Amino acid sequence: MSKTYLPPQESLERDWYVVDATDKRLGRLASEIAMILRGKNKAHYTPHLDTGDFVIVVNAEKVAVTGKKRTQKLYRRHSGRPGGMKTETFAKLQQRLPERIVEHAVKGMLPKNSLGKQLFTKLKVYAGPTHPHDAQKPKELNINTIPGAES
């Protein structure tokens, strides 16, 4: 009978990464971020434990989408009251709350349970180029979202 490997919690080293979202494709960027938050890039990945790293996303206001998604992609939210459905296009939400676009995309790629909520707290998204996490000494992470392009 095989036994699931459990890495000791003391040995888990959580790194901090900073990702620049300028001109990056939203979905491809979000899937890479979700993989790092989950810890799938590490040798001691365990599905039911939080083994991932922290990710800081800067320049969320400059994230890119392809095709007509800028005008046709809709984000919906509901207040819980009758007739309380609010609909907003990608372009309007990007003007109003650019962080929410990246957060929404990454959250959809994480587990839909308590572990997913815990992983989501390790994502920090900022609209502009600055962030308040310099004390953590984050490493620059370059994510190539354009297939075949060198970066």
From Swiss-Prot:
InterPro entries reported in the protein's UniProt record: Ribosomal_uL13, Ribosomal_uL13_bac-type, Ribosomal_uL13_CS, Ribosomal_uL13_sf
Lineage per the UniProt record: Bacteria, Bacillati, Cyanobacteriota, Cyanophyceae, Nostocales
The protein's assembly and partners: Part of the 50S ribosomal subunit.
Protein name: Large ribosomal subunit protein uL13
GO molecular-function term, one example from the UniProt record: structural constituent of ribosome
GO cellular component term of the entry, any: cytosolic large ribosomal subunit
Biological-process GO terms, alphabetical: negative regulation of translation; translation
Protein family (similarity comment): Belongs to the universal ribosomal protein uL13 family.
PROSITE patterns for this protein: RIBOSOMAL_L13
Domain of life: Bacteria
Keyword annotations from UniProtKB, A to Z: Ribonucleoprotein, Ribosomal protein
Disordered, as annotated region: 129-151
Organism: Trichormus variabilis (strain ATCC 29413 / PCC 7937) (Anabaena variabilis)
Ranges annotated as biased composition (Basic and acidic residues): 131-140
One Pfam family of this chain: Ribosomal_L13
The protein's role, per its UniProt record: This protein is one of the early assembly proteins of the 50S ribosomal subunit, although it is not seen to bind rRNA by itself. It is important during the early stages of 50S assembly.
